[in-house]
Amino acid sequence: MTINHFTFNMKIAGDFNAFNALAAYSVLRELGLNDESIQKGFETYTSDNGRMQYFSKGNKEAMINLAKNPAGMNASLSVGEQLEGKKVYVISLNDNAADGRDTSWIYDADFEKLSNQDIEAIIVTGTRAEELQLRLKLAEVDVPIIVENDIYKATAKTMNYTSFTVAIPNYTSLAPMLEQLNRSFEGGQS
């Protein structure tokens, strides 16, 4: 991202994070920090809460980003669009009380954009895995779609692929998906 002819490098992707960074930049400049100091902060910031959190171990890489609504899902799918090379997705949808019982919002998300990506497989999981599978079929996503209701097992299956893993949980599936990624990438969180 370039602001006033100064290029800032960030470890987190996504248009929404660029807007957050721009807001942070504005406040930090107002407080008197210079561009070099702000750059150090941007370069060293990492997330550990399942929001644009990256993992790497050997040649395997992954990213997890929470999606609780169409806007969050679209943002996560857009990050996948920006990644070069093959990808494997693991997408989880639960309908527990904390998630909200109504999962019809997935029909407002733009899953059709997956058709333009180089995807080896999509693993769907959670209490509404079959609903995700149907949504992907309606979006005419022509890649293998694997249903694994157990979130831990579904997330672990992504390690069978050498391609980049894009993990997208909703609220109550975040903890088990993040726990499994931490196990799989032991010592490889970035």
Language-model-derived ranges and their functions:
Residues 130-138, 143-190:
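Generic C-terminus detector
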Residues 61-62, 87-91, 163-169:
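Generic beta-sheet signal
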Residues 23-26, 75, 79, 157, ...:
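Alpha-helical scaffold segments in soluble metabolic enzymes
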Residues 6, 58-60, 113-119, 140-141, ...:
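Short, surface-exposed connector motifs at secondary-structure boundaries
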Residues 20, 24, 122, 167:
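Residue-level signal for inorganic ion chemistry
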Residues 66-147, 188:
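Active-site beta-alpha connecting loops in nucleotide-dependent enzymes
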